[in-house]
């Protein structure tokens, strides 16, 4: 909301107030929150629905902080920050180098080549992910823009779902998901209900992931797979390398524009 709403909007004000008082949301009634935000209870309810919850109660239930909020076994603080604080950063840097080397040795350029070729033929392209994978999708948008290719990405979970649901056969979807969970679970709500939006879309789907099982998903056209050789989650670095190779291949396969000399 803070990235998409104007700073003068009511929803921006509500979002900022809730974030500044995040620790009390799970203990507060809708009346308490409405008073805190100086808006009506109905406005709070509308705000909750606008960000993907059925009502304020569901928002409240999902607000309890937990590092494993998205049900991943390896998380940023426990997997990266705590070991750095305990043992220094040498092991972490060594892990990044090892995983990059493993990708260099094991990477399959066929899938990267195919995605690059698809980027030259598909005009409607969306790239999505969650957390650090979402950051990768945004980076990919910028990197492709430097090559003259403009794609769509959204941080809003609802806008992502809307784009995927409305995608047709002329749409290319690129999904960044280290674990592959983004394809199977709706991770906004606390009970992570099953996500079937990808099963119903008509788009061609490429997935960039470390999970080999994604190859077996019937709705996935192709997978760009990268290995993990260490205990650290280094996918945010591997993503950057994969994206740079894709952009390079895209430029290679892009036919130069022809100039008509007809009068």
Predicted regions and their residues:
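N-terminal intrinsically disordered/low-complexity leader segments
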Residues: 1-5
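Short, mixed-charge aromatic SLiMs
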Residues: 70, 165, 262-263
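Glycine-rich phosphate/diphosphate-binding loops that line cofactor/substrate pockets in enzymes
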Residues: 111-122
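Glycine-rich phosphate-binding loops that contact phosphosugars or nucleotide phosphates
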Residues: 120-242, 247-255
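Internal, active-site/partner-interface "lid" segment
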Residues: 254-263
């Amino acid at each position: 909301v803070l990235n998409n709403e104007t700073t003068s909007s009511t929803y921006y004000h509500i979002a900022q107030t809730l974030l500044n008082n995040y620790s009390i949301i799970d203990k507060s009634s809708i009346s308490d929150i409405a008073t805190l935000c100086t808006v009506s209870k109905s406005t709070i309810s509308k705000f909750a629905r606008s960000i993907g919850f059925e009502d304020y109660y569901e928002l409240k239930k999902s607000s309890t902080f937990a590092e494993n909020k998205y049900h991943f076994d390896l998380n940023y603080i426990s997997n990266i920050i705590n070991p750095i604080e305990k043992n220094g950063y040498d092991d972490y840097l060594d892990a990044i180098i090892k995983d990059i080397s493993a990708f260099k040795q094991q990477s399959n350029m066929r899938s990267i080549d195919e995605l690059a070729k698809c980027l030259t033929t598909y005009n409607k392209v969306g790239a999505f992910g969650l957390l650090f994978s979402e950051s990768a999708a945004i980076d990919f948008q910028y990197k492709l823009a430097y090559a003259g290719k403009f794609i769509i990405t959204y941080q809003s979970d609802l806008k992502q779902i809307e784009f995927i649901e409305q995608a047709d056969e002329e749409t290319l979807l690129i999904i960044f998901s280290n674990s592959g969970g983004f394809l199977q679970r709706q991770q906004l709500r606390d009970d992570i209900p099953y996500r079937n939006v990808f099963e119903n879309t008509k788009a061609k789907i490429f997935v960039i992931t470390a999970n080999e099982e994604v190859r077996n998903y019937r709705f996935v056209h192709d997978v760009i797979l990268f290995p993990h050789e260490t205990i650290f989650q280094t996918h945010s670095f591997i993503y950057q390398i994969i994206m740079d190779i894709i952009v390079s291949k895209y430029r290679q396969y892009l036919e130069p524009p022809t100039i008509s000399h007809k009068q």
